[in-house]
Structures are given as structure tokens and as C-alpha cells.
């Protein structure tokens, strides 16, 4: 066997008939499979042991030679070689065809490859191949033309007329003869001449033909190899036949298809031997052709061959295609050993890096390790006895198990794995029962809950794998989310409400205004009932020496609450004392306003002071982020565990419950509703009198009811008691939101009808009062729609993620610095007066391209090529800088990836990114994972303005990344200049916008309803939108440069996500957009040997030009092309990656003709062939590290005086 890690690249090509015979270990002559009586393979059949190898290890068919000592001997009686039975998975056979047969892939695909080489239409080819028409191969002296088609009758007439002065053939052999006569060199030269003057359709066809002919010339494939003389038979163990209970057999469809080919082939041979009439032979040849077509790609032409129950048989092509095909089912994802799955349950007492492993699972997973240890400790004499001990569940096995699982991390995975946090490593802890225990804080990353979710567990075996699991994948390291660098492990639900309740302040609580010496005294007072958790008290500041108070503050008394003292006790040493949930307190230290001079009256102060809000979920998240920034991983994971324990403990003690009495009634509700009814009546009256249109009436009614609902909501919020448990749940961010409340205590409001339109009939009741039957019925529409929407959204979002991953999988950080001289000028993204993404978010964690100066005094804030951290970003914003030029993936020069400087900070660690990081996959996951949270629907602007609907949410993201023509497009100006006039033409329903540029004047016609973005007299740049709507990037790239197009796409994608409150770092979006613009279309080839119109990778194009320039030639010119992600993924340089994505047969057909070589740079191609993945620790740089001897060996120790003497000499 070859070692997969030894080869550099993989090539694919057409197989010549000789090659097929060379691979083969023998010809399959009979359609038989196995003998049903003896169950032995039949001789010369599809499972023949002489051809494919023995069915049992080291045993020939007749049993003369058994055992490994006869290895390599061929039995003289049955002719079977004595070897391993595994060879039945590797050895091929072949079938010698009695007549040549065309390969359906090359005849059928679009465009038909055979048709292009022969310059014939697929229609004519079909007539020839399937024996409907003859074709002239050699016209000789006759007036016939080469490649002329003749019907049966015409052929007979010409034959009687000219005799054997011409040659015409039919079927596969005719095609073979034609292909053999093609002179590729001559054709190529003719086409190149033709291209010089051709245009339109003719030119396109010529370019296509030249492309294919050059492909044949370059790859060394011969066109006649598209016709088969012999077909390979794949190894029998890849198309097995198994016996079912009851003596019946189940077999792979391929065997049926092969049998048909062999049957027809044998019949044809017999007919030829018998010299049968031509028509019978022709019919048999046609049937053979169809049988081979069905074997290669069943159903591609005509009706598919069906098996029992009219089920189409699965041919060789189907074995590769789709989710169940070879690529996606077996090569990209395999089932693995040492794995298990079980239901998960909550493990509140676990540490951040632990998981609970049920004993029975541990026994099975760690079996070999336990066996080795049992033998090692002398508890079992050999491995067999050790296995027996485990099966018997002896007592000493359990002691060994405890030690074996120590320090051995395991991987936990929950499907669907939407981002890289879906697989994390934990240290196992044995638990009883059969459910695995998961740490409550790890739930958010996995999106897991405990309502019956299952998870899979995997065991890293080798020392390297264990080391990587421990160092890179331990759950404690995954505190920040890769998409935005915000903590992903934040306390939720009970933990939030516990800490919220703990940090609440209550006026007039028991013991208010007491002053304590230190935390221990406070605890004592609390336990003895002198104070409550919510009591506001004073504490000597110098009793907390580890808190960073100022010197002045240390002499004073801190006003805080008992609960806050307890909360601050869990924070790391040296972290600020948190007294208020403000950013100022968190970043700049405890504010002076919370301190008292000694001697001031504390009670008087407390009466004047407002209550401070408790700590909500968002603030806890900020605290974690700040701790992570200051103390890094270890301290943060310890804090998280303490926060979790405190939250659970305090929420239990708080005794929060929800009862019907907690849902208050709003006394003003009837008045508000009556007023709304009155307004609706007024609007209806206006409509009846014809003062307003029906649409306007509808809009107003909807508006009235929405206002009424908002009014009720507002008043509910004002009357809520901050101690109300429902309010606390929502306010703390533990569960629920305002609208849930309005529905419980206010009114449910308007509902959507099944068609998505909002019904004018509002639901006036709330759930506390109960709904009427009609109201209940109206509500159900929404519930059903919600369910279906979610289901559809999940599928759509998953498919989007798959396409994104596929297009960006080979983007890896490949070098430290690409040395580019271009940067990206960025500013905040805003729409009108709504801020979409502030500048701070955009520059944080990026490298500068140029220095940034303070606009007021000209001081340098940061130099070029430096990383912008939080402090510097804050400085830049405070200095009032509006634009910064940064290093960006858009301008990075690294081929097949990005460099560290252009990428910037790794969002998941907060440090600079390292070489080897698979940033493309991370980017795809970061954009795809929140996809399920985006809405599915298109928002209708509705109303009188009659503007086109704007697409939002998931459909808009797909529209952008697939670069489709947008719905509701905006017209763009192709010139820079002034808007001269906007003239409306009500008769036509249009308006004309005239723009006067420096050289020419352009006029654009828009519908009269379009909302304008420009006014008369405006000065606009080319590429600016004239009306509201989405710009088509394909149009934009024609009038602007690539960078502005990329910038536009970036802001459009960010707009969609930010509107839904989802933050994604720019760099992820940049990587995806860069992948859409990696290709160029060659316009003029210059002196290169590229064909005009070729789609090329930018880097390949640059390299070709570089070589041409060095040789003194004229370089080629090209223009950038924007491809949708599906198209871009299929156009990748790796045929393995493209074939495993979509359109498998088309990709492979094309790759085979071109003799493509897959350089194996991306991740997918390496996964497919089983090579180590070239990212992370699999990068070649990291794998070729050799220890180096740094200093010379010191023979004998020198005396100090000698050394001193030497030093002095060198100094002098």
C-alpha cells in the first residue's frame, strides 16, 4: 500500500484501453456471480477468485493450500493465488467488448465533449451512436462530405451508386474512427486563426472548442479514449453479495448492471461468430451500448433501467453523487472507532473542563487501556485474561478504570455542529447511571439543553492527539466566540437570576446603614439575621487590600450591599470592586461617589441616594470579557465556575416563584381599547366617504392597534414592581422579554394571517383573562407558521453554511506578513441616521496600514503595521478620527490564504492569529451559524409609496453571496458628475434622471414610484445609487474598482446581521467576499498561451504574466469577475474539492479531459485522500521541526580567571 502522507498531488485522466487491461487481473467472461448451492464464486464470473483473489485469508478455492506459509503461491488445481482476502477490495477485472462503445459522460454532458472535438451537434452524435444514421468517415472520390449523416436508405443507395469508393460507419466504431482522424494540432491552429476575426455565437463556440482541444493536447489524453473497447470491472468487495436469513441474497445494483453488459456482450460475440444478419447485429450493438450507459450513469439518457419494484438501479455515477455518495458519505466523514453516544444531563457540580462519563461507557471506551494496565499491574496474566476480567466486571477492574481515565481528555460533539465550538475536549469524571453529564456553562456553545438531547463522545488515542485535545480544545479555552470575540460561556437562566437577586438593593431593609469592619463580620451579621442580602451597608475600604482602590478611597467607607460584598468575593484578586453595573465601574475602578468620609452620617446619605440597579446578564458577560482580557484563560474559567455555583446557590435561596397573582391587571386597559375602537371607526368613515384608499385605511387601522398595544405595554412597565418575580426574570435577562409580558397582562395584539399579511382583527384579551374561541383560532395561524418557518430556516441556513465552508475551506493563515502596500480605508457603517456598525468595532484587533494622527494636535496615536487594541481603539474614537486605513483580507497578497497582519486578531483568543489557523472555515461558520436566527421573510415596505419590497434576513444574505440579481434593484450612475434634471412623465409612469459627467451625459429612466436618493444639483460619483434599493454588484464592478465592490458587499452583509442584533467581525465577511472575487476573465492573451475568455485564478494569472514579462513578452489583460459562492466553489483549482461539493459527474468529466492535477492545498482534498490536514499543527512548517544543537559541547569546565582573561582580550 502507498502511504498517503508521501504523495504531493493527485492527477486524474482518461484511461486508455491498454491501461484498463493493465489494471485488470483477468477477464470476466460469464454473468454468473456465485453458485447458490455451494456458495462459492463461479469460475470466470463476476466474483471469480482466480481474478479477484481468495475469499478467505491465505486459502485457495479448492483448499489445497491453507495457512500463511504458502503466501504468494498460485494453486495448480484451482488457479487461485494464496494471499490476504483484502485484495478483493483492490483487484480489478475487465470485460472485452465485442464492439466499441462510447462513454456516456463525454457524449452527454453539457457541453458535449465529443461534440466539441468533432464539431458535430449532440443530436447528430446521438443518431450515430444509437444506430439511427450512418456517418461518412472517408468520402474518397465521391461528392459526399466527411462527417455527413446518411439514413439507412440513403446509405444503401450510395453504396449501390459508389460501391467501396467511400467509407461510412455507424455506432461507437464510427465515433471511434472519427476521433482517431482528428488532428488536434491542426484544429487548434485553425481555431486560433478563426478567433482573430470571429464574433458573437461563432466566437463563443470557437473558444469552447479550442479550450477542449488544447486540454487534450496539454494533458496527453487521446480523444479516441472517450470510446471504450474494454470496460473495467470494479473489485467484488466494493459491490458485495450477501446472504440474508432465509437463503435469499442481497446484491449491489452494480452486479445487475454488469450482468446485463456481459450477457449482451456474449450474445453479440455469438451473433458475430454465426455471421448473423446486419440488422440483428446492429440491434445487439445498440443494446450493448445502452447496457454500458446504464452501468456508467443510469438514467442519464432515456428511461433508467429498473430493478425489482420499479426502482431505478444505482450506477457507478450514483455511487459518487450526493449526500449518500462515496465522497460525502465515506470520504469526507467516516464513522470512527472509540466513540459512543448517550443522552446528556446537567452536571452542576462539575468544573469547567470536566464532563461526567457513565461507568459502562467508560469501560467500553477505555477497554484496551484497562487491559494493558491490568496486565501491567500483574492483575491478569495475559491480554485474554484481562478481557475476561472486564467482561466479568471484576472489582479490581474499577480501581484500574479510575486511574486509566485520569489525564485522558475526551471529545464531546453535539449535532448539528454549526461552529467549531460544537466539538470540545473535557476531562472525564466517572458518574453512575447511563447519561453523560455536561457542564451547564458549556451548553450555550453547543446550543444544548437537557430535554433529551444526545451527544457523541470520542476518545483521542495517540499522545499527540491527547496533547492537542488538552492544549487546544479543552472547554476552558473556549471562552470567547470566534465570530465576534465576545464571551460565549455566559451564565444563563438560574445563574443569572441568582446573581441578579444577590446584587439587588432594597431601601429600608433590616439593618440598613450598619457599618462593618470586613467581609467576615458581614457574613456573621447575615447568618444571625441582623442584615438581609439586599441591605445597604458601609464597609471599611482598607479591609479589602487586594482591591485596586485609590489611596484616598482606602481611608474612606464604601457604601455597598451585603449581596455585592458576596459577589465581589468571587472575583479574581486585584480586580475592581463592582458596585454598579456600569462600564465606568468595570474599566476605570469604583467611582468616588460610593465612598463616605469617616464621620459623615451614613443613614442620611442613604436616604438621599437612589437605588443602584442589580447586575443583569449583559453586565455579567462584560465582567467575564474584562477578566479574560486581564487574567486570560485559567483565572476566567475558575471565575465562571464560582459565578455558576454562586448563581445556583443564591437563586435557590431566593425562592422566586411565579403565580397568577404576579400578573397584574391594568385598570386603564378598557379605556385605551375603547379609544382605539373609536379611531378605527373614524378611519372607516373616511374610507366610506372616499377620502382615503383601501390601502391607506388598512395601514392606519394596523397603526392604531399597534399604538394601543404599545401604550398598554408602556403603562404596564411603569406599574411593575421591581420585586415582581416575572419582572425580575425578564429584567435580569434570565428568561422572557417585555412582549411575553404584554401578552400575559396587557393584550396579545395583531396576528398574521396564513398568507403573511397582518389581520386587522386584534386579539384584545391577554392570557391572564383568557382568549375567546375566535381569538384562540386566530392565534393558531401564527404558531403553525412559526413552526414551519423554523424548520425551513434550519435547512436553508445549513445549506448556506455548507456552501460557505466549501468556498473558503482552503483559506489558511500561510505567512507572517505578505508585504502588501495596499490597505482598506474604513469608516463607520451607517444607514441614514441609524448606526449599523461603529468604527470602534471595525478597527479593533486589526493592523494599521498607515499611521493614525489625532486631528486636533497632529500627534501620532499609532504607527503603521501595528495592532489596534481596545485602549488604542478607544483613543482613536475619542480623538474624533472618522476614517482609518487598515490591513485587510481584501488587499492581502498571500496566495491560497491570508497573512497574520492582514487578518489581525484571532477573535477566539484575543491574541494575534497564528500561522496555520484555518480562518476560512472559521469565517464560514461564523457567518453560517447565526443564519438560523435570521428571518426568512421579505419585509414589505407596503404603503402608498409603492416601493419594491426589500429583501432581508436569510434570503438577502443568499442573494449577496450567490451574487444574484437583487430584488428591488437600485439604478447606479456610470459617470461622475452633477444631476442636471429629474423629469417626471406621469403618462408613462416614469421619471428620467440626467447626469452630466465630464465627458458625456447619461440619462436613466426609473419608475415614477421609485424613492430617490439624489436630488437635482447633487454631485455624485460613478457607482452611486440613484434610488433606494440594492445595487447589483455585477453592475457595480463594471463602473468601479474591485475594492469598492468588496466594500459595498461587506456593508450589505453587515447590515442584515446587525439589524437582527447579531454581531459578526468584519474579517470573516471579508474572507468570504474575497473568495467570490478570486477569479478574472482574460480579455486579451497578449504573448501568454492563455485562451481569451478563460476564467482564471488571480494568482495563476499573475504568475503567467510574470513569466511572460520576464521573457520580454506582452502580458495578458483581464477583468475581475464576481462569482456566487456555489460557482466559486465549483471553479476551485482542486477537482476533488469541487467534485465532493456539487455536480460531481460534470466536475470529474472536465477534470479527466484536462488531466487535472490536484495540488492538495485545501482541507477537503486532504481529508478525502486521508492525508494529514495542512492547517493548524498539520502545517508542514510545524511538522518538519528538528531539534537543533545550540551550543558546542563543553569538554572540561574552565576556571573563572581564564574566562575573565579572554573577555578582557576581546574588549581590548
Curated annotation (Swiss-Prot):
Q: How is the cofactor bound?
A: Binds 1 Mg(2+) ion per subunit. Binds 2 Zn(2+) ions per subunit.
Query: Matching Pfam families, A to Z?
Result: RNA_pol_Rpb1_1, RNA_pol_Rpb1_2, RNA_pol_Rpb1_3, RNA_pol_Rpb1_4, RNA_pol_Rpb1_5
Q: Where is the signal peptide?
A: none
Instruction: Region Disordered: list its residue ranges.
Output: 1193-1212
Q: Which SUPFAM superfamilies match?
A: beta and beta-prime subunits of DNA dependent RNA-polymerase
Q: Does the keyword Nucleotidyltransferase apply?
A: yes
InterPro entries reported in the protein's UniProt record? DNA-dir_RpoC_beta_prime, DNA-dir_RpoC_beta_prime_bact, RNA_pol_asu, RNA_pol_N, RNA_pol_Rpb1_1, RNA_pol_Rpb1_3, RNA_pol_Rpb1_3_sf, RNA_pol_Rpb1_4
Which GO BP terms, alphabetically? DNA-templated transcription
Keywords assigned by UniProt?
DNA-directed RNA polymerase, Magnesium, Metal-binding, Nucleotidyltransferase, Transcription, Transferase, Zinc
SMART domains noted in UniProt: RPOLA_N
Q: Does the keyword Magnesium apply?
A: yes
**Basic and acidic residues bias: where?**
1202-1212
Residues engaged in binding Zn(2+) 2: 818, 892, 899, 902
GO molecular-function term, one example from the UniProt record: magnesium ion binding
Q: Which residues cross the membrane?
A: none
Tell me what reaction this enzyme catalyses: RNA(n) + a ribonucleoside 5'-triphosphate = RNA(n+1) + diphosphate
GO annotation, cellular component aspect: DNA-directed RNA polymerase complex
Q: Which cofactor does it need?
A: Mg(2+); Zn(2+)
Q: Give the EC number.
A: 2.7.7.6
Tell me, what does this protein do in biology? DNA-dependent RNA polymerase catalyzes the transcription of DNA into RNA using the four ribonucleoside triphosphates as substrates.
| Similarity section | Belongs to the RNA polymerase beta' chain family.
Quaternary structure (record): The RNAP catalytic core consists of 2 alpha, 1 beta, 1 beta' and 1 omega subunit. When a sigma factor is associated with the core the holoenzyme is formed, which can initiate transcription.
This protein's name: DNA-directed RNA polymerase subunit beta'
Instruction: State the species of origin.
Output: Pediococcus pentosaceus (strain ATCC 25745 / CCUG 21536 / LMG 10740 / 183-1w)
Gene this protein is translated from: rpoC
Amino acid at each position: 500500500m502507498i502511504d498517503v502522507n508521501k504523495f504531493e498531488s493527485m492527477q486524474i485522466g482518461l484511461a486508455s484501453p491498454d491501461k484498463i487491461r493493465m489494471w485488470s487481473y483477468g477477464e470476466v467472461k460469464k454473468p454468473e456471480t456465485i453458485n447458490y448451492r455451494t456458495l462459492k464464486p463461479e469460475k470466470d464470473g463476476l466474483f471469480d477468485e482466480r481474478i479477484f483473489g481468495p475469499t478467505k485469508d491465505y486459502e485457495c478455492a479448492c483448499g489445497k493450500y491453507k495457512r500463511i506459509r504458502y503466501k504468494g503461491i498460485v494453486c495448480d488445481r484451482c488457479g487461485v493465488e494464496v494471499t490476504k482476502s483484502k485484495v478483493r477490495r483492490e483487484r480489478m477485472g475487465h470485460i472485452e467488448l465485442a464492439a466499441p462503445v462510447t462513454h456516456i459522460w463525454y457524449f452527454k454532458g453539457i457541453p458535449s465533449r465529443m461534440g466539441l472535438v468533432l464539431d458535430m451537434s449532440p443530436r447528430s452524435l446521438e443518431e450515430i451512436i444509437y444506430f439511427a444514421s450512418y456517418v461518412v468517415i472517408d468520402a474518397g472520390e465521391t461528392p459526399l462530405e466527411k462527417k455527413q449523416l446518411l439514413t439507412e436508405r440513403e446509405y444503401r443507395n450510395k453504396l449501390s451508386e459508389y460501391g467501396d469508393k467511400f467509407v461510412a460507419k455507424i455506432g461507437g466504431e464510427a465515433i471511434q474512427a472519427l476521433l482517431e482522424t482528428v488532428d488536434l494540432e491542426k484544429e487548434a491552429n485553425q481555431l486560433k486563426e478563426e478567433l482573430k476575426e470571429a464574433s458573437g455565437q461563432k466566437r463563443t463556440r470557437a473558444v469552447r472548442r479550442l479550450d477542449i482541444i488544447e486540454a487534450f493536447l496539454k494533458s496527453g489524453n487521446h480523444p479516441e479514449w472517450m470510446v471504450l473497447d474494454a470496460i473495467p470491472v470494479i473489485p467484488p468487495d466494493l459491490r458485495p453479495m450477501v446472504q440474508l436469513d432465509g437463503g435469499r441474497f442481497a446484491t449491489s445494483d452494480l452486479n445487475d448492471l454488469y450482468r446485463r453488459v456481459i450477457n449482451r456482450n456474449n450474445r453479440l460475440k455469438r451473433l458475430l461468430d454465426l455471421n448473423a444478419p446486419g440488422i440483428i447485429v446492429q440491434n445487439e450493438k445498440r443494446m450493448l451500448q445502452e447496457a454500458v450507459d446504464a452501468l456508467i450513469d443510469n438514467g442519464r439518457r432515456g428511461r433508467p433501467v429498473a430493478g425489482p419494484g420499479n426502482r431505478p438501479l444505482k450506477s457507478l455515477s450514483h455511487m459518487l453523487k450526493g449526500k449518500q455518495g462515496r465522497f460525502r458519505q465515506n470520504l469526507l466523514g467516516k464513522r470512527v472507532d472509540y466513540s459512543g453516544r448517550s443522552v446528556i444531563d446537567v452536571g452542576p457540580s462539575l468544573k469547567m473542563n470536566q464532563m461526567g462519563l457513565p461507568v459502562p461507557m467508560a469501560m467500553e471506551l477505555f477497554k484496551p487501556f484497562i487491559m494493558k494496565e491490568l496486565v501491567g499491574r500483574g492483575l491478569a496474566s495475559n491480554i485474554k485474561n484481562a478481557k475476561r476480567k472486564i467482561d466479568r466486571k471484576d472489582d479490581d477492574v474499577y480501581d484500574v478504570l479510575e486511574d486509566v481515565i485520569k489525564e485522558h481528555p475526551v471529545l464531546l460533539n453535539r449535532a448539528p455542529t454549526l461552529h467549531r465550538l460544537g466539538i470540545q475536549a473535557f476531562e472525564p469524571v466517572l458518574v453512575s447511571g447511563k447519561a453523560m453529564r455536561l457542564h451547564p456553562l458549556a451548553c450555550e456553545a453547543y446550543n444544548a439543553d437537557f430535554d433529551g438531547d444526545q451527544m457523541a463522545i470520542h476518545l483521542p488515542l495517540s499522545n499527540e492527539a491527547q496533547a492537542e485535545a488538552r492544549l487546544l480544545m479543552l472547554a476552558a479555552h473556549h471562552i470567547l466566540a470566534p465570530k465576534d470575540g465576545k464571551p460565549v460561556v455566559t451564565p444563563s437562566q438560574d445563574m443569572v437570576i441568582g446573581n441578579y437577586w444577590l446584587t439587588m438593593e432594597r431601601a429600608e431593609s433590616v439593618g440598613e446603614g450598619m457599618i462593618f469592619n470586613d467581609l467576615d463580620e458581614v457574613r456573621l451579621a447575615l447568618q444571625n439575621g441582623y442584615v438581609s442580602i439586599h441591605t445597604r451597608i458601609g464597609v471599611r475600604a482598607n479591609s479589602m487590600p487586594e482591591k485596586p482602590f485609590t489611596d484616598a478611597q482606602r481611608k474612606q467607607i464604601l457604601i455597598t450591599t451585603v449581596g455585592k460584598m458576596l459577589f465581589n468575593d468571587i472575583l479574581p484578586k486585584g480586580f475592581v470592586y463592582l458596585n454598579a453595573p456600569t462600564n465606568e465601574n468595570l474599566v476605570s475602578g469604583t467611582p468616588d461617589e460610593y465612598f463616605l468620609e469617616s464621620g459623615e452620617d451614613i443613614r442620611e446619605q442613604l436616604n438621599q441616594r437612589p437605588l443602584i440597579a442589580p447586575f443583569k446578564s449583559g453586565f455579567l458577560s462584560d465582567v467575564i470579557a474584562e477578566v479574560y482580557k486581564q487574567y486570560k484563560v485559567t483565572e476566567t474559567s475558575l471565575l465562571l465556575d464560582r459565578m455558576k455555583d454562586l448563581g445556583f446557590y443564591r437563586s435557590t435561596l431566593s425562592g422566586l416563584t411565579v403565580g397568577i397573582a404576579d400578573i397584574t391587571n391594568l385598570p386603564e386597559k378598557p379605556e385605551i381599547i375603547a379609544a382605539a375602537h373609536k379611531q378605527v371607526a373614524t378611519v372607516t368613515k373616511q374610507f366610506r366617504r372616499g377620502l382615503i384608499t383601501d390601502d391607506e385605511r388598512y395601514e392606519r387601522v394596523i397603526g392604531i392597534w399597534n399604538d394601543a398595544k404599545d401604550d398598554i405595554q408602556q403603562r404596564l412597565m411603569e406599574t411593575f414592581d421591581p420585586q415582581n418575580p416575572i419582572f425580575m426574570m425578564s429584567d435580569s435577562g434570565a428568561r422572557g422579554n417585555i412582549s411575553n409580558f404584554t401578552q400575559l397582562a396587557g393584550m396579545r395584539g395583531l396576528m398574521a394571517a396564513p398568507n403573511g399579511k397582518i389581520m386587522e382583527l386584534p386579539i384584545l384579551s391577554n392570557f391572564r383573562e383568557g382568549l375567546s374561541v375566535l381569538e384562540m383560532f386566530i392565534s393558531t395561524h401564527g404558531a403553525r407558521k412559526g413552526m414551519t418557518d423554523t424548520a425551513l430556516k434550519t435547512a436553508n441556513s445549513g445549506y448556506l453554511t455548507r456552501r460557505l465552508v466549501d468556498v473558503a475551506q482552503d483559506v489558511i493563515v500561510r505567512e507572517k506578513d505578505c508585504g502588501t502596500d495596499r490597505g482598506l480605508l474604513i469608516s463607520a457603517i451607517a444607514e441614514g441616521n441609524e448606526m449599523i456598525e461603529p468604527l470602534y468595532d471595525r478597527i479593533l484587533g486589526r493592523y494599521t496600514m498607515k499611521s493614525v494622527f489625532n486631528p486636533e494636535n497632529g500627534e501620532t496615536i499609532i504607527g503603521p503595521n501595528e495592532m489596534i487594541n481596545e485602549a488604542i481603539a478607544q483613543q482613536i474614537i475619542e480623538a474624533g478620527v472618522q476614517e482609518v486605513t487598515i490591513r485587510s483580507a481584501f488587499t492581502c497578497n498571500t496566495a491560497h490564504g491570508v497573512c497574520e497582519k492582514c487578518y489581525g486578531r484571532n477573535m477566539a483568543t484575543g491574541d494575534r492569529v497564528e500561522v496555520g489557523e484555518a480562518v476560512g472555515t472559521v469565517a464560514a461558520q461564523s457567518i453560517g451559524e447565526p443564519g438560523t436566527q435570521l428571518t426568512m421573510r421579505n419585509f414589505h415596505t407596503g404603503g402608498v409609496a409603492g416601493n419594491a419590497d426589500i429583501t432581508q434576513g436569510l434570503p438577502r444574505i443568499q442573494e449577496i453571496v450567490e451574487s444574484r440579481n437583487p430584488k428591488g434593484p437600485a439604478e447606479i450612475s456610470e459617470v461622475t458628475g452633477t444631476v442636471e434634471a429629474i423629469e417626471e412623465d406621469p403618462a408613462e409612469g416614469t421619471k428620467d434622471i440626467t447626469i452630466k459627467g465630464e465627458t458625456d451625459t447619461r440619462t436613466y429612466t426609473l419608475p415614477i414610484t421609485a424613492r430617490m436618493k439624489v436630488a437635482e444639483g447633487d454631485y455624485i460619483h460613478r457607482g452611486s445609487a440613484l434610488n433606494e434599493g440594492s445595487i447589483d454588484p455585477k453592475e457595480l464592478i463594471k463602473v468601479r474598482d474591485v475594492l469598492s465592490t468588496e466594500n459595498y458587499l461587506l456593508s450589505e452583509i453587515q447590515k442584515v446581521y446587525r439589524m437582527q442584533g447579531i454581531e459578526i467581525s468584519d474579517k470573516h465577511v471579508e474572507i468570504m467576499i474575497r473568495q467570490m472575487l478570486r477569479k478574472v476573465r482574460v480579455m486579451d492573451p497578449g504573448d501568454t498561451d492563455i485562451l481569451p475568455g478563460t476564467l482564471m485564478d488571480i494568482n495563476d494569472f499573475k504568475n503567467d504574466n510574470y513569466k511572460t514579462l520576464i521573457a520580454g513578452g506582452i502580458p495578458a489583460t483581464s477583468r475581475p469577475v464576481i462569482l456566487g459562492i456555489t460557482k466559486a466553489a465549483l471553479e476551485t483549482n482542486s477537482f476533488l474539492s469541487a467534485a465532493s461539493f456539487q455536480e460531481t459527474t460534470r466536475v470529474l468529466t472536465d477534470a479527466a479531459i484536462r488531466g487535472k492535477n490536484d495540488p492538495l492545498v485545501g482541507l477537503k482534498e486532504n481529508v478525502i485522500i486521508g492525508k494529514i490536514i495542512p492547517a493548524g499543527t498539520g502545517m508542514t512548517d510545524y511538522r518538519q521541526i528538528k531539534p537543533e544543537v545550540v551550543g558546542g559541547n563543553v569538554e572540561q569546565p574552565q576556571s573563572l580567571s581564564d574566562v575573565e582573561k579572554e573577555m578582557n582580550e576581546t574588549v581590548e
